């Protein structure tokens, strides 16, 4: 569960994980001021075999999620239904942190998303949490939609 301003998002298990351990999660996004559901559905953006590691709202109140593979996604509206009554929503990837790691053991601990940048704590050496005895150093990573590499770019 995460909230900011007038919005509240609740995440829950829709069913047991798949055989490859991918979580089957759902979400409901509420406007708490009006007591109405804005959006609900599956968290379809999780990478195969990964799990949800962080949820939050950016400073523009867009809902963001990150999985254990380091993929940051944002809930975006894609239009309206055929009756023009309900907005349609989808998860869009906005940053893949895998390519930004210096080692396969490195990862990024998200703090917030602000002005198009992920504010995070870089973790090294297989650590999955920041050291609680030291003040962490944060870094910012600009959001950029991940693109698939073509066959030609691999040569």
Language-model segment annotations:
Residues 5-7, 60-61:
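Short coil/turn segments that connect the beta-strands within blades of beta-propeller domains
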Residues 14-16, 21-155:
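Intrinsically disordered, low-complexity regions in large eukaryotic scaffold subunits
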């Amino acid at each position: 569960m995460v909230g900011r301003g007038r919005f509240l998002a609740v995440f829950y298990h829709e069913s047991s994980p798949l055989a490859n351990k991918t979580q089957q999660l759902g979400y409901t996004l509420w406007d708490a001021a009006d007591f109405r559901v804005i959006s609900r559905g599956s968290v379809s953006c999780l990478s195969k075999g990964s799990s949800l590691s962080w949820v939050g709202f950016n400073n523009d109140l867009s809902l963001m999620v990150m999985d254990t593979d380091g993929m940051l996604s944002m809930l975006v509206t894609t239009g309206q239904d055929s009756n023009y009554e309900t907005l349609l929503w989808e998860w869009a990837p906005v940053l893949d942190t895998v390519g930004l790691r210096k080692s396969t053991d490195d990862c990024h601990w998200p703090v917030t998303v602000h002005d198009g940048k992920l504010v995070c704590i870089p973790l090294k050496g297989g650590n999955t949490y920041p050291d609680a005895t030291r003040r962490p150093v944060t870094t910012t990573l600009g959001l950029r939609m991940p693109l698939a590499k073509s066959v030609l770019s691999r040569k």
